[in-house]
């Protein structure tokens, strides 16, 4: 039932609350028929509610005070003097109103019976929309405001009280759920129709009621700014409005209410969306406290502020901004709570069933979109500006003279053949027209064009290198006639695409100009020269070397800038020719004029490699330490480019790559003849390949010191085996004949002209390009281009040829030269057939000959002084003859060059042939060659630099002669011998080592730094082994009782030993003991020895069994005498004791050995196990009757078993260095017992907690103590909230402990510390390792507190039992029990 007015609704609400607290839930008025059945079922759940006054919430008290004040003001019979006397005393204890943090301000207690809510009327009986309620309440307020003049109070009080009534009804009545409010109305109202007529009459009267309408303009601006700031901070923040002193127009209020009624009719009650804008919890409580103080002190100010704030909320156009927030926040409740920032602000709640529409021009969303659009626009502007900066580059071009402009004009006129030429022509013409305005652009165009050509040539060179990484096949070397005819035409012009690509590699200002145009326009210089380009802005300038097709060496140009001409922006050229050295361009900043005769490189130039190794790292001139490395296994150039360059340089003829049939032929860029004479093509480029240093070893090219193709080398006829055979060089006659032949050959001019031919060899296809293998002596080879080098061939002969004295004349030399000339032609014509010899080395071709053999010391035979030294070196002693006879005729360790063109070529030196890889055949012996080299060097009177030094690879090992090694004295000799022996063993096992090398010793040559990785903290030991000695059974000893024997056991783990006390050995020989021992296991795999020791007293006398002959008495006088034999024991002095040979000098009789390996330790890990070990005697000696005095010198018996050792073993491994192991296993079991006892500690009950997860407050929780876990449960839900680990608690303190401590510390006239008694009285403190403290209060009884303290204290005291080994051992024992 709805009450007659709003005042009746508040009275009914308060009365209903009082009625619910005082009377049981089951005794409710049975006026409603539909609630009678539920009242009967719930009649048993009767409960009386009584609540102290201090437990009523602050907001509830605020609401009650305001309501009573309003009633007292309106009531004409109210007397202010009787306020205190008329107050009902039961209101202090009977009100139980519970508030939570939600927007729903009023709700009943959770434990109240639900029958109160069951009396709600249906929707068909009454309109329960919130708009209706608000309108009705507003009508009541207006109606009452018209009747205020009838009250006996003054006008000022009437207006203020009227405002209080309207403000209270609109702001503090809990109408968040209109159905519940209508239920409250219905409980006290009995006439629905009367209430309806009352509301309609009030609504009709309120239309004519005028309201103050004066509102200042600056107040709206202030409200607007406050709304902006609130929405910008958070969508869920509060809307703070400053207080206004003027109310808004009443007509606008009526219009708003009518609009709300129309919207409510269209919208159903179920679809109400509730959204809340409220302050944080802290702010709400703060404001409520402020509100309480204000209401108690000054009610008039609050009434005025509430009235003004209410009108501002209803009339402000900015309040529509609330609809822009999320309508689903806070449980979809559409309550807007608007709080003022000022001191006089109050808590206001506005409710409606529809969303309030607000038009915010400066809303935060619009602002955000506007800011984002501006940012995007700014970003686009910045990007566009950046592009403009990138594209609009300022180009500074120097001016040109008239001659240069005319030259450039001629260049541009002839560029119509290609696309790039046409572009350059247009640029040149345009620049000619605008020359007066900006003549600098022409110079930059030409400069960039020349640089583009330079890059194009560089790319061409790189293309040539990339195209010819694969080895050329024989059929590829021959091209069709069409290609040959098109040679010049196809070579004269660059490919258009490649010109464009090469120019694109530079800056954007580069323009590609055809080379033909430059050739016609630029001045003509010497043909076949190298042109080099230079950019003004470049610091590092790369030079390109261009070679002629016929292999001629280009003359390089060097351009130096004149400083005076730089000021006038004119370029001059200074040419410096140098045939021997390779020069680079200086950074002068000027451009050069290109020669008209530009030639593409036949072969891409080789990179210049500077010296990166020390010539003689060990400082000894005649060091030949080559035993540690196989010289023939050294790395050699295996790429085609290096091979062709070396072949062309040494053979002095056109490379197979530069023939007309080669693919390199189409790279020529000039119309000049390609048949010009070639000088040298070995040069270097500005770009240097940086080699990777593998070690400190140094590679030296042997060809730089020994001319491989010298006319003075030995030439031997094929199929001849005689005096000139290397095996017969020991005779002086052969050497004389040989020298005569050499002298005759030097006079022959025809021989020199027939030596100029080339041998083409296809290298191993598996070889890779390696720049670091290229010789450092290429400059020396290129500088000797004027010399005519000839090939020196030596061909092995068979034994059919016999050298005669008549061959010493000149005719023999001419005939020999003719023979070799014919043979050389046959070699050229028959590459694969004539050079393809059988694998028999007698018929193999020796390219270098004997003089280049690794063991020979002769370097050049052109001088007579060298011939004398050679004669001395060729003298062979008897020892050398025996060596040569034991070795076959392949003594020179000829290397076999493997190629796909021919089978084998025997090589004496065995390093490389023009960069080709050479492998040693299986039949050669490197050891013999090394021995020969040492013998020759040792016999020479004057030391001559050996060719081995020129060709070998330096080694970090120093060779020491055996004599010096043996003669070394000092304490370090033996140690060095051991090290050398170990090195020799490792060298023999290695596959790359040389057999039977001399003893060597190491010299440090690389400073190695060993970086140790951080490892985990090492454990001090592996754990403890607990031994419980049960006894020693079946001891094999006799006469124990007579020797008064005693025993003891000794335990030795390798570091420490322990011994038991001496005890008497039982006579039966079984020792039964029960001793505990603890042995630390320092390392897994160690051994533990248990020794049985005995000591005894040797007996002084001994009892011996004696057989005596006893005479039997005669029966007759003259009868025969008879005897009998009797055995008896006779005591005598002992001469020998059997125990003397059974024991060691220290009394050891038996020893048991326990191997502490992983298998044994794992079997007894956390498991007590009985084990039996054999006691072995290894000290017993053989019986020797002759040597009784020297017992210990008698030979020993093999060890044998003398007893059985019984022990109980358990192993506990270590996990942490902080673990502490007891000294015996009995203590371990005691600790396990305490550990189990701690786990059984339990206690539960209610405690008040302070600290931990509870800050500045006391929380009552239900605690359970189980072992080391103290778990706190929620008082209502019984869910676990907090778990306290008692293992981290180091102390438990109570108030009694504080008293005891104070009594000990207090002395004399010292005062008591009452602060601790007040703060900690009745509490239990838990002190943690991090000094955190949690206080627990037992609010039940003192005995409960004592029990909690004792349980917690015992738990903390037993924390010492918690170690890793304790937990594992307890679990293992639990498994055994199961």
UniProtKB/Swiss-Prot annotation:
Residues 1240-1357 form the PH domain. It comes from the Eukaryota. One of its GO terms (biological process) is protein localization to bud neck. The keyword Oxidoreductase does not apply. Residues 431-441 have a biased composition (Polar residues). It is found in: Bud neck. PANTHER family: BUD SITE SELECTION PROTEIN 4. Required for selection of future bud sites. Cooperates with other bud site selection proteins to recognize a spatial landmark during mitosis and they subsequently become a landmark for downstream polarity establishment factors that coordinate budding and cytokinesis. Involved in the septin organization at the bud neck. This is Bud site selection protein 4. The lineage of its organism: Eukaryota, Fungi, Dikarya, Ascomycota, Saccharomycotina. The gene is BUD4.
């Amino acid at each position: 039932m709805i009450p007659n007015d709003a005042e009746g609704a508040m009275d009914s609400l308060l009365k209903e609350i009082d009625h619910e607290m005082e009377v049981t839930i089951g005794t409710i008025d049975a006026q409603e028929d539909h609630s009678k059945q539920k009242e009967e079922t719930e009649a048993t759940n009767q409960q009386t509610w009584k609540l102290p006054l201090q437990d009523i919430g602050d907001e509830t008290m605020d609401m009650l005070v305001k309501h009573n004040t309003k009633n007292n003001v309106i009531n004409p019979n109210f007397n202010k003097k009787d306020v205190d006397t008329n107050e009902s005393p039961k209101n202090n204890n009977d009100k139980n109103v519970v508030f939570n943090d939600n927007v729903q301000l009023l709700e009943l207690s959770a434990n109240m019976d639900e029958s109160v809510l069951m009396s709600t009327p249906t929707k068909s009986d009454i309109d329960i929309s919130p708009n209706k309620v608000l309108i009705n309440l507003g009508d009541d307020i207006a109606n009452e405001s018209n009747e205020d003049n009838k009250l006996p109070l003054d006008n000022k009080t009437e207006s203020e009280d009227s405002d209080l009534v309207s403000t209270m009804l609109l702001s503090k009545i809990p109408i968040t759920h209109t159905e519940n409010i209508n239920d409250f109305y219905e409980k006290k109202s009995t006439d629905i129709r009367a209430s309806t007529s009352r509301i309609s009459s009030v609504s009709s009267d309120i239309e004519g009621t005028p309201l103050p309408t004066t509102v200042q303009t600056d107040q709206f601006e202030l409200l607007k700014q406050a709304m902006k700031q609130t929405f910008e901070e958070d969508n869920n923040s509060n809307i703070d409005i400053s207080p206004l002193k003027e109310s808004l127009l009443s007509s606008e209020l009526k219009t708003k209410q009518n609009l709300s009624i129309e919207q409510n009719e269209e919208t159903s009650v179920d679809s109400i969306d509730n959204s809340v804008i409220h302050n944080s919890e802290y702010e709400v409580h703060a404001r409520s406290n402020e509100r309480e103080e204000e209401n108690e002190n000054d009610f008039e100010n609050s009434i005025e502020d509430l009235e003004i704030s209410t009108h501002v909320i209803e009339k402000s156009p900015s309040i529509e901004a609330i609809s822009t927030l999320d309508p689903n926040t806070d449980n979809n409740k559409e309550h807007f709570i608007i709080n003022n920032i000022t001191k006089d602000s109050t808590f206001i709640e506005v409710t409606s069933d529809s969303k309030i529409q607000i038009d915010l021009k400066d809303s935060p969303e619009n602002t955000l979109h506007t800011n984002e659009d501006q940012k995007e626009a700014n970003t686009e502007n910045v990007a566009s500006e950046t592009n403009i900066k990138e594209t609009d580059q300022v180009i500074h071009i120097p001016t040109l003279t008239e001659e240069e402009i005319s030259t450039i004009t001629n260049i541009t006129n002839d560029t119509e053949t290609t696309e790039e030429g046409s572009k350059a022509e247009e640029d040149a013409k345009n620049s000619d027209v605008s020359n007066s305005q900006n003549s600098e652009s022409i110079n930059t165009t030409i400069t960039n064009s020349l640089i583009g050509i330079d890059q194009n040539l560089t790319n061409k060179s790189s293309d040539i290198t990339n195209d010819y990484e694969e080895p050329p096949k024989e059929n590829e070397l021959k091209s069709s006639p069409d290609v040959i005819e098109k040679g010049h035409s196809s070579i004269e012009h660059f490919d258009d695409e490649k010109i464009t690509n090469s120019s694109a590699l530079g800056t954007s200002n580069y323009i590609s100009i055809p080379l033909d145009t430059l050739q016609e326009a630029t001045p003509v210089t010497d043909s076949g020269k190298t042109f080099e380009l230079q950019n003004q802005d470049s610091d590092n300038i790369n030079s390109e070397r261009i070679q002629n097709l016929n292999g001629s060496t280009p003359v390089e140009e060097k351009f130096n800038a004149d400083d005076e001409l730089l000021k006038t922006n004119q370029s001059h050229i200074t040419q410096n020719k140098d045939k021997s050295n390779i020069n680079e361009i200086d950074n002068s900043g000027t451009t050069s004029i290109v020669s008209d005769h530009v030639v593409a490189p036949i072969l891409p130039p080789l990179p210049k490699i500077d010296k990166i190794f020390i010539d003689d790292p060990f400082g000894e001139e005649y060091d030949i330490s080559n035993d540690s490395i196989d010289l023939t296994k050294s790395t050699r150039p295996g790429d085609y480019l290096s091979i062709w360059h070396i072949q062309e340089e040494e053979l002095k003829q056109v490379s197979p790559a530069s023939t007309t049939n080669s693919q390199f032929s189409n790279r020529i860029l000039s119309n000049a003849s390609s048949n010009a004479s070639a000088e040298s093509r070995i040069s270097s480029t500005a770009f240097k390949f940086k080699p990777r240093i593998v070690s400190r070893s140094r590679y030296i090219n042997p060809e730089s010191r020994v001319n491989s193709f010298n006319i003075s080398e030995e030439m031997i006829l094929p199929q001849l085996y005689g005096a000139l055979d290397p095996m017969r060089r020991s005779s002086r006659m052969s050497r004389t004949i040989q020298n005569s032949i050499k002298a005759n050959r030097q006079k022959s001019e025809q021989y020199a002209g027939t030596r100029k031919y080339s041998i083409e060899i296809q290298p191993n296809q598996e070889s890779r390009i390696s720049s670091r293998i290229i010789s450092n002596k290429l400059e020396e080879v290129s500088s000797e281009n004027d010399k005519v080098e000839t090939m020196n061939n030596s061909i092995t002969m068979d034994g059919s040829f016999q050298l005669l004295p008549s061959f010493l004349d000149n005719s023999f030399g001419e005939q020999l030269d003719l023979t070799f000339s014919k043979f050389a032609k046959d070699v050229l014509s028959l590459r694969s057939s004539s050079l393809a010899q059988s694998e028999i080395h007698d018929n193999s071709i020796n390219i270098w000959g004997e003089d280049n053999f690794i063991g020979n010391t002769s370097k050049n035979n052109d001088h007579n002084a060298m011939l004398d030294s050679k004669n001395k070196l060729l003298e062979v002693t008897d020892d050398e003859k025996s060596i040569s006879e034991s070795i076959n005729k392949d003594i020179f360790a000829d290397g076999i060059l493997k190629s796909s063109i021919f089978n084998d070529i025997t090589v004496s030196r065995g390093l490389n042939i023009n960069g080709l890889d050479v492998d040693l055949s299986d039949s050669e012996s490197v050891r013999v060659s090394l021995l020969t080299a040492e013998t020759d060097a040792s016999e020479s009177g004057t030391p001559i630099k050996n060719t081995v030094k020129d060709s070998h690879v330096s080694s970090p090992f120093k060779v020491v002669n055996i004599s010096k090694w043996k003669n070394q004295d000092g304490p370090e000799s033996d140690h060095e011998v051991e090290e050398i022996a170990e090195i020799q063993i490792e060298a023999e096992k290695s596959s790359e080592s040389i057999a039977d090398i001399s003893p060597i010793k190491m010299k440090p040559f690389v400073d190695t730094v060993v970086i140790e990785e951080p490892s985990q903290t090492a454990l001090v030991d592996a754990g403890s082994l607990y031994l419980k000695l049960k006894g020693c059974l079946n001891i094999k000893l006799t006469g124990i009782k007579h020797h008064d024997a005693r025993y003891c056991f000794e335990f030795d783990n390798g570091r420490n030993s322990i011994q038991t006390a001496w005890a008497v050995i039982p006579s039966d020989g079984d020792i039964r003991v029960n001793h505990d021992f603890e042995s630390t296991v320092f390392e897994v795999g160690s051994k533990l020895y248990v020794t049985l020791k005995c000591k005894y007293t040797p007996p002084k006398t001994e009892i011996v069994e004696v057989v005596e002959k006893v005479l039997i008495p005669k029966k007759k006088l003259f009868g025969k005498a008879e005897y009998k034999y009797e055995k008896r024991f006779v005591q005598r002095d002992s001469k020998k004791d059997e125990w003397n040979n059974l024991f060691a000098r220290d009394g050891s009789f038996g020893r048991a050995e326990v191997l502490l390996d992983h298998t044994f330790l794992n079997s007894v890990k956390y498991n007590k196990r009985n084990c039996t070990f054999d006691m072995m005697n290894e000290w017993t000696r053989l019986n020797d009757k002759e040597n009784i005095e020297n017992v210990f010198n008698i030979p020993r018996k093999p060890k044998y078993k003398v007893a059985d050792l019984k022990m109980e073993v358990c192993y506990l491994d270590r996990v942490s260095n902080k673990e502490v192991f007891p000294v015996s296993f009995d203590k371990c079991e005691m600790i396990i017992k305490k550990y189990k006892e701690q786990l059984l500690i339990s206690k539960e009950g209610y405690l008040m907690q302070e600290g931990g997860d509870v800050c500045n407050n006391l929380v009552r929780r239900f605690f359970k103590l189980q072992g080391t876990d103290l778990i706190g449960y929620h008082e209502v839900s019984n869910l676990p909230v907090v778990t306290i680990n008692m293992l981290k608690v180091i102390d438990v303190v109570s108030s009694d402990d504080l008293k005891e401590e104070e009594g000990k510390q207090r002395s004399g006239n010292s005062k008591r510390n009452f602060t601790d008694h007040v703060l900690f009285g009745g509490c239990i403190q838990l002190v943690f390792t991090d000094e955190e403290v949690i206080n627990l209060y037992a609010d039940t009884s003192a005995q409960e507190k004592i029990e909690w303290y004792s349980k917690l204290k015992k738990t903390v005291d037993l924390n010492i039992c918690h170690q890793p080994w304790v937990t594992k051992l307890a679990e293992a024992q639990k498994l055994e029990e199961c």
